[in-house]
Amino acid sequence: MSFPCKFVASFLLIFNVSSKGAVSKEIRNALETWGALGQDIDLDIPSFQMSDDIDDIRWEKTSDKKKIAQFRKEKETFEEKDAYKLFKNGTLKIKHLKIHDQDSYKVSIYDTKGKNVLEKTFDLKIQERVSEPKISWTCINTTLTCEVMNGTDPELNLYQDGKHVKLSQRVITHKWTTSLSAKFKCTAGNKVSKESRMETVSCPEKGLDIYLIIGICGGGSLLMVFVALLVFYITKRKKQRSRRNDEELEIRAHRVATEERGRKPHQIPASTPQNPAASQHPPPPPGHRSQAPSHRPLPPGHRVQHQPQKRPPAPSGTQVHQQKGPPLPRPRVQPKPPQGAAENSLSPSSN
């Protein structure tokens, strides 16, 4: 490599090292500042007092060298996007901190002669506030748990009766054996917030745990509800079965009554022949000649002789009861002539 090339390379290397040293020195001299996410923060300039000799105060982000606020005498104050506010004493307010606001901020102050009288860098870091810790315990194995749900890089500390017993980040589990009753304090904190909670734990020497008692009571209640539902179901089934039986009996009785009502018209003619006299026609009045149907009247002599042969024998009661099925048609019975008419008909023959 030629001498001019070596000289240029050495110059660039020296310049690069010196610039890195300046940046490192600037970050090392920066004032570390912590801000809470979603909150406002004021960047106060230490060891600075505003005077009439100050002409220019300028704030910028060191990451992109971008001006975000500026105060100049007899000129309007510049503030970017309403996210910043610059006070007359040089303090910069950053509103509603967000994650991307985490950066380094540099302030430069000049007097009326243009001389740089002060430069200061702030290294802003943002964290989420911690939530209040929660304490829970069980008396069966004398174990206590403390935990924090929210917060950036939380730090938990547990104290028993004022004595520090444990340190952790998110969850602390502690088993105590000194006594059955104790006072516990759990604190959670980070760079921007701190929360604490205190509980007095008292466990009985002998007896059931509260959770066991609740479980037994709950199980007993469920058992009682189940038994009540079972009794109600059985009672309802019995009522339904009884109602169904009653309906079946009623339907059966109605059917039997309907069948008996249908048989009655066929049984009435069969029972009437038991009283033959009631079924005969009423005797005709005296002097009336009875005639057989579809026959001409015969002479008196023949009428007396053939009249007894045309009377059919009356059916007996036993025959009526032995008959089964529908009743058979009966022959028409010829009415018996009155006694006076018979004597009148016989008198000419006797003469």
Swiss-Prot record:
> Ranges of Pro residues compositional bias?
326-338
Tell me the protein's name.
Answer: T-cell surface antigen CD2
| Region annotated CD58 binding region 1, chain positions | 61-75
Bilayer topology reads:
Single-pass type I membrane protein
Gene name linked to the record: CD2
Domain Ig-like C2-type: start-end pairs: 129-209
Provide the disulphide bond pattern: 139-203, 146-186
Where would one find the signal peptide in this protein? Answer: 1-24
Biological process according to GO? cell-cell adhesion; natural killer cell activation; natural killer cell mediated cytotoxicity; positive regulation of type II interferon production
Q: What organism does the UniProt record list as the source?
A: Macaca fascicularis
